[in-house]
């Protein structure tokens, strides 16, 4: 008997055998929807191609007014560069100084050209005043899940200041190369920073219990073996990912770790991530037969995704 899309995807995520391989995309790019699919939304795109739906929606957060008053975000101007891209400068005012970043918006994506944190002292300002939610509201997730029905699953993003994990988030704040050099030169300082970041994520994740979402997406390309060595990830990535993954599991969520890069040299570390699912962008040639024999029974692969 044919499974529903929801049954199919959840079966695959449990390392079971669905009636067929689930078919989905890792999010629809607005540029693609606008320019290649006639402006349809993600719901219409999934339906058009007969895919299994994976809808991204996260909780709404409520903050203490005093915390927000100590973290005033202003756009200080917008300009157009020589390529026609819109450039914006953001300034954040806190009681202990200001932080600044520059963001470029293209038709396809947005990216930072000036990191928010330039020096280590900037992190201490950030750490003291970056607002952490006091309450969560799952209404947007429940509304989406009611609409979705058995057509697929709900994926959420964690509360993290950059992407999905402490190491990746710090790289987006401080720069990947600078973050790597800090780990080599001042490992204790980097551990202090990563601990501060993960503590904020854990505080919010404690409020995620009973979320209607099915999965949370963590990680990022900065944790892959394309960017750092497996030993570097073992020290500065794995311990923090394990802690937040464990708490997400306690909240009833599947966890997908996106390394978005090389993974084969660090498969033993993937196993240590616990019951997470891991997504890489390794080539199709990286099939289970290539895995070390000690690891092979503990992972399941389906087109670039490893489930532990």
What are these regions (language model features)?
Residues 32-71:
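Segments that shape or occlude catalytic/ligand-binding pockets
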Residues 42, 86-88, 137-140:
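Generic hydrophobic, aliphatic-rich segments that mediate packing or membrane embedding
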Residues 26-28, 60-61, 92-98:
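Short, flexible beta-strand-to-coil junctions
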Residues 49, 83, 96, 174, ...:
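Short glycine-rich loop/turn motifs that provide flexible caps or phosphate-binding loops at active sites
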Residues 71-132, 151, 157:
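A contiguous, low-structure linker/loop signature
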Residues 1-28, 32-35, 124-308:
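Active-site loop segments of alpha/beta catalytic cores
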Residues 59-72, 77, 157-164:
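Short, glycine/charge-rich beta-strand/loop segments that flank catalytic centers
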């Amino acid at each position: 008997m044919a499974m529903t899309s929801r049954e199919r995807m959840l079966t695959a995520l449990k390392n079971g055998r669905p009636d067929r391989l689930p078919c989905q995309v890792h999010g629809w790019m607005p540029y693609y929807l606008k320019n290649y699919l006639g402006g349809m939304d993600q719901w219409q795109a999934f339906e058009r191609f007969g895919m299994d739906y994976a809808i991204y929606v996260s909780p709404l957060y409520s903050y203490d007014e005093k915390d927000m008053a100590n973290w005033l975000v202003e756009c200080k101007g917008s300009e157009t560069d020589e390529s026609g891209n819109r450039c914006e400068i953001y300034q954040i005012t806190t009681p202990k100084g200001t932080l600044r970043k520059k963001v470029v918006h293209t038709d396809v994506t947005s990216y930072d050209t000036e990191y928010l944190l330039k020096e280590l002292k900037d992190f201490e300002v950030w750490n003291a005043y970056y607002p952490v939610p006091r309450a969560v509201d799952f209404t947007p997730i429940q509304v989406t899940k009611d609409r979705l029905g058995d057509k697929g699953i709900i994926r959420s993003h964690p509360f993290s200041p950059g992407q999905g994990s402490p190491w990746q988030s710090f790289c987006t704040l401080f720069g990947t190369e600078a973050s790597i050099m800090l780990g080599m030169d001042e490992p204790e300082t980097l551990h202090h920073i990563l601990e501060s970041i993960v503590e904020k994520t854990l505080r919010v994740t404690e409020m995620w219990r009973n979320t209607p979402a099915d999965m949370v997406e963590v990680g990022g390309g900065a944790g892959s073996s394309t960017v750092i060595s497996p030993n570097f990830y073992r020290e500065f990535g794995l311990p923090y990912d394990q802690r937040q993954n464990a708490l997400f599991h306690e909240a009833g969520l599947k966890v997908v770790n996106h390394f978005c890069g090389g993974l084969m040299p660090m498969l033993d570390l993937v196993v240590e991530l616990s019951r997470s699912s891991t997504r890489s962008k390794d080539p199709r040639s990286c099939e289970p037969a290539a895995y070390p024999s000690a690891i092979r029974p503990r992972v399941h692969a389906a087109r670039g995704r490893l489930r532990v």
